[in-house]
From Swiss-Prot:
MF annotations from Gene Ontology: rRNA binding; structural constituent of ribosome
UniProt record, GO biological process: translation
Protein name: Large ribosomal subunit protein bL31
Source superkingdom: Bacteria
Assembly notes: Part of the 50S ribosomal subunit.
Organism: Chlorobaculum tepidum (strain ATCC 49652 / DSM 12025 / NBRC 103806 / TLS)
Amino acid sequence: MKPEIHPKYTKVTVNCANCGTTFETRSTRNNNIKVDICSKCHPFYTGKQVLVDTAGRVDRFNKRFAKAAPKASAQ
């Protein structure tokens, strides 16, 4: 291996934004790493399914654009 061309491999702290878990690992990044979701809180690993209620958003979208549809067809 050539000297002085490889990145330094240091210890970094990984912080989960969802559950607040922190753990140490090694990486070529110099600073801490923030992740949105980790293995402690991910539904695949925990076995808990989180349902996202999008029905209200879809209904609101359809109502908003149902009013706009007759105006477009009248022209």
